[in-house]
């Protein structure tokens, strides 16, 4: 195999591995992989560097709670391809906008948080359906859980329902169990106990279907607790 072909093969394997870890929220494995593989030296295209910094920023956010550093990485990721004058957006640009919103909320900057979360939703209308569109279900989860943390439960429920509709539209269960789980949690907070239990059963069923064992255990724990 020529050096050029070998380089392309290595590059493809690196991106594929990163996507598996990232899409399944396996951030500890992703962070270790980014560090040990030194993969940034293999990336030269803007879209690849964007994905690298998106992954890095996500690891800083979810694992290290280093929100300022996470925001820096996410903004750097966005700048590789994003322009506010664009008439269309890529899937990852929309996802990064949403994650920037979440990060601002964690930093206590609520107004900026919802600005970016709503920007990501507004950009959704410019995306054509493709094989990776299902990933965008995450943006509904992000804005809904941010509303829940903000105590605006009715708005949270609206976006959870929209997320469920979107998942059905793209015929993919990515983040579907998480959406139903959050719906159940909010329904329970609103004292709609029977509805909450029903929604948690749905969340559990979807989690089992996609083999999300962590969420299976969590949903069962809630069901047992709420039925007491």
Segments from the language model and where they lie:
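Structural motif corresponding to the intra-repeat A-B loop/turn of tetratricopeptide repeats
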Residues: 24, 63-64, 100, 107, ...
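Structural register within alpha-helical repeat arrays
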Residues: 17, 56-57, 100, 143, ...
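Alpha-helical adaptor scaffolds
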Residues: 96-171, 175
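Residue signature of alpha-solenoid helical repeat architecture, marking inter-repeat boundaries
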Residues: 8, 47-49, 84, 88-91, ...
